[in-house]
Amino acid sequence: EWGVVKAVRSKGIFVMMDIQALKKIEISPHLIACHVRRYLDTLDLLALTIEGVSAYAAAHIAQNEIEEAISDINRCWNEDHLYMLTPSFLLNLIVKHTGDGSLNAVYTLLRQNLGIGRSIPALCKTEKTAEDYELYEQCITALNQLYAGRQEDFSNRTAKVFRYIYDYVTEKCKNLGYYDSAMAVYDGSALWK
């Protein structure tokens, strides 16, 4: 059960707000705009680059690592609130095999930033959605393709997974009213001038 508690030393833990009260809190989009923008930029960069990076990593991933990733995904899929980590296990496996250079440094940061999404209000639900089932199936399919030695299929599927996440999250941020505030954090077009 979700809520807010206050711990007072030597007195105990007191419930300050239950789940119903938490749902009534409205957070202004500009207060979280930087976090939303960083998350969207992370997803965008992953969607743009993951196909080549996963193709490179695929050649170095051992069968037992694939089995472990599948096992981790299946374990978390059946635990409340952990099912959202499914794409993280796929990304973790890839990051482990990006070498020691700048690519690894960038992808390690992207992996860390992927967790931002879990802290954005109303972006994640406690119940599994059709999109969650789709992501689960796609991640497992990608890993099974890699396990079968089909590295190109693995990298193509992985690219589709992260493009799907980017498109889904972008649309959800627009529906929640976060997108415009996030895009106003800085002028992204200046990067290409």
Feature-to-residue mapping (PLM):
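Amphipathic alpha-helix face/heptad-repeat signature
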Residues: 38, 42-45, 106, 131, ...
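Mid-protein regulatory/catalytic core that forms ligand/cofactor-binding pockets
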Residues: 51-141
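Short linear motifs at protein or domain termini
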Residues: 1-48, 52
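Residue-level recognition of short, well-ordered coil/turn positions
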Residues: 4, 81, 150-151
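C-terminal all-alpha effector/ligand-binding and dimerization domain
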Residues: 113-193
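Short, solvent-exposed helix-helix connector turns and helix-capping sites enriched
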Residues: 18, 100, 150-151
